[in-house]
Amino acid sequence: MTQYKPSPRPNYHEPTPLPYASTARHLWGDAEAGQVADWIYVSSAQIHQIVWGLAPGGSFRHSAEFRTIFGADLIYYVLSGTMVIANPEHGEVQRVLPGEAAFFRRDTWHHAFNYGTDPLRVLEFFAPPPSQGTSGAYARTKPLLAHSRYTDDRALGRWPMERAAIEQTQTITVVRDQDLLWRFEDGQLLVGLLCSTEHLTAGKLLLPPGHRSGRLCHPGDKSLYLTQGTLHVFCPDKPDAPNWFELHEQDGFFLPAGSCHEFHNLTGQPVECLFGVAPTYC
């Protein structure tokens, strides 16, 4: 039997670039739960950011040692592949495509499947993070789910006539581009929110060629993942050099609470960057 061991928890105390090539690698799971490859960018006292992956046809479920129920808010943003995610306690199933996200809250059992021919890669924001006892330690306090269901027969005979009532009972929300809550920060930076709770605000920022943001500061920790383009990050209050950083696709960046920063796009290509802030955005 493979015993559960906590994943690595890289943490930083100043603005820090997180190159993809330098991320901590971890293999989660066992024969019963399935195995998941993790690329761990940061796991601070406030936020946890990883990319996890499944091969085509791969999946994760749960076992006695590896239980998939947490005491946190989570975003699973699909970078590549097709994710089918289920709540096996109720039978709820959602299909999530690249550029879409699944959002769920604490005490949600979940299983995930790569339902396509491409590798599945998913960006995860998790808060409160494992350092606060919200992952494996929390899961072991919950009764083990003995039976898994992947159909919700409560909706039969009622769909789509009672769609609103059925969706009201669902525990996993799929967030697509048309569902983003848009903000125009200081009239300069376009930000679309995937979620905003008392624990986690996550979203994507868009920066056209030649544009820059204003000065941004958050009371919570902030982590980034670059999905498109080349992004420069300026940290004017960082006391020691360097304070000017260049990010490429798949790179991350960490900003401790209160770290003021600016985003610059010096190229002729658009920038898209995903972010999480925890616990407080502003």
Residue ranges and their predicted role:
Residues 31-38, 50-70, 201-218, 257:
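Conserved short histidine dyad/triad with adjacent acidic residue
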Residues 5-8, 111-170, 262-282:
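Double-stranded beta-helix
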Residues 1-50, 137-201:
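A short, N-terminal "cap"/entry segment at the start of jelly-roll beta-barrel domains
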Residues 53-55, 68-85, 125-128, 204-208, ...:
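Short, conserved beta-strand element in jelly-roll/cupin
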Residues 62-64, 85-86, 94, 104, ...:
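Short beta-strand His + acidic residue motifs that chelate non-heme Fe in jelly-roll/DSBH
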Residues 89-106, 237-257:
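Short acidic-glycine-tyrosine-enriched beta hairpin
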Residues 46, 88-90, 117-118, 198-199, ...:
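Short strand-connecting beta-turns/loops that link adjacent beta-strands
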